[in-house]
């Protein structure tokens, strides 16, 4: 009889220990859960990226500088370089903007072959993408962002100067209303624009093309970004201004390189007004804008301004400096860029423009970089 109470006491003691252990384990699990899920504060920090190319006094690219070799200012105030890289491992997005107005009819074949060779040389299949846009009286995306060399080559093959029929209408150069092989671009008169942003009209819509390429395509991309414009630089009929085109590239952190092909005969002065002549346009007879000779814009100065303010360069095609050699120079720059970043004042008003000045401590070196950025974008 005396063994039963003892056994009961032992059982009660065991049960108490077990329950206490479960409670302790539960408390520990709760504590562990609390430890794994701390409250967090998310802070978005704006970083201004400044890609740069450095040359010596002979024009040779310098590629062995360190972060401390640079001096960076915003609106005259020194800035600390928070991020610095000098490698080409970042993804690259390239955009080709090809002028297909009548002024470029003599050079289009040369542009086509050199452009494909450049893309074939630059694109890495796993990282890089490119797109092709043509512009004349409309802006059309012939090939959207892709890493496929075959698709890009196909788009370049569709580039043509417009043909005009005997009745004075634009017969279309790329399949009538069908456009190019990827007619999902910004056509002004061939089936609607991408995201509704296409601008149609008469002339050569250079500014519209540059704006749309930056705002619709480049702005969404990460890494290194460069637009290459092949044109004589004279805009006819754009709805947007030169300032708007430059601003869109700056907001998209996109460098613009310009390849200038001069129109020796100035064919468009005779009344074609670009590809939109003899039809289409915005209610103007003959399509496009016809500049009197004394009012004709300086296309070289226009392209120089676009490229300089975005950190790029203007190249002028000549017998001594053909387009394939120019593409080689652009490729060399893209392979030897420095990427600097700094954090601006968060109190800057949204949309306000701020001047950037980047130089090296060595006064014999010249830095090529963007000249500013827009806050809060």
For the regions a language model picked out, list residue spans one by one:
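Scaffold/interface architecture of coatomer-like assemblies
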Residues: 21-377
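Positively charged n-region of N-terminal signal peptides that target proteins for export
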Residues: 1-5
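Bacterial N-terminal signal peptides
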Residues: 8-20
